[in-house]
Amino acid sequence: MQKIKIIIASDSVGETAEQVAKACVSQFNSKNFKSEIVRYPYIETIENVDEVIEIAKENELNIVVFTLVKPDIKQYMEERLAENKIKHVDIMGPLMSILTDKIDEQPYCEPGIVHKLDEAYFKKIEAIEFAVKYDDGKDPKGLPKADIVLIGISRTSKTPLSQFLAHKRYKVMNIPIVPEINPPEALFEIDPKKCIALKISEEKLNKIRKERLKQLGLGDSARYATGQRIQEELEYFDNIVNKIGCPVIDVSDKAIEETANDIMYIIEQNKTNKSE
């Protein structure tokens, strides 16, 4: 019975090449030969390549299947394989060459980038689920876990901002500030720099609330939209903000995207300052 060793060489984990090798082997009658798939991940130096070549030279039936994207390592691998007459398959090279010609753009040549993309996707999903779970101050336990905490009175776009930022992979919790309800104590215990207060002008808020009442089929004379009630809420909001000592963004005449960009700038600046 023939014994064939398929050597997987990759500058990342080697999962792609191994899956291709397994798919190919499964197409043959395993009674006629015995195959062994050996994975050599994280090929980063010419010494790593030499190790693969030495293993491959042990048997003329051995095959090297590689996914290497760093040009210098890939070229060295191809030269060593050719000079030793080792059968080999470049999984990614041919397609990357065609894509380069077709779209007239050079590839990143960065190992493991597909896993980074997967990680980014799952972080986004996690952030979206977080925003839903902790929307409208549902559970104070979310405060220490949040990357960003938004506070503001009603109609300051807390929920849409939370969702927008979640799609940017930030875990966001929002808490409504209402005079009749004390904010959770944990709000005053978190880092104030990750808390963003959303401020709105009295005139703008009055207009928004009256429009909201119309949509609900109610008269615009409800206390919810009166100047006295709005002033009361804004004063209470200012007191809470002063107690926390957090940054404030005026959302009166801003689109969601613009406010979100301001929030991300503040948060990222704080991260930069912390690392210095």
Curated annotation (Swiss-Prot):
GO molecular function: ADP binding; ATP binding; phosphotransferase activity, phosphate group as acceptor; protein serine/threonine kinase activity
Binding site for ADP: 152-159
Keywords: Kinase, Nucleotide-binding, Serine/threonine-protein kinase, Transferase
InterPro entries listed in its UniProt record: Kinase-pyrophosphorylase (IPR005177), PPDK_reg (IPR026565)
UniProt-listed Enzyme Commission number(s): 2.7.11.32, 2.7.4.27
Catalysed reaction equations from the record: N(tele)-phospho-L-histidyl/L-threonyl-[pyruvate, phosphate dikinase] + ADP = N(tele)-phospho-L-histidyl/O-phospho-L-threonyl-[pyruvate, phosphate dikinase] + AMP + H(+); N(tele)-phospho-L-histidyl/O-phospho-L-threonyl-[pyruvate, phosphate dikinase] + phosphate + H(+) = N(tele)-phospho-L-histidyl/L-threonyl-[pyruvate, phosphate dikinase] + diphosphate
General function of this protein: Bifunctional serine/threonine kinase and phosphorylase involved in the regulation of the pyruvate, phosphate dikinase (PPDK) by catalyzing its phosphorylation/dephosphorylation.
Family in the record: Belongs to the pyruvate, phosphate/water dikinase regulatory protein family. PDRP subfamily.
Xref: HAMAP family: PDRP
Name of the protein in question: Putative pyruvate, phosphate dikinase regulatory protein
Organism: Staphylococcus carnosus (strain TM300)
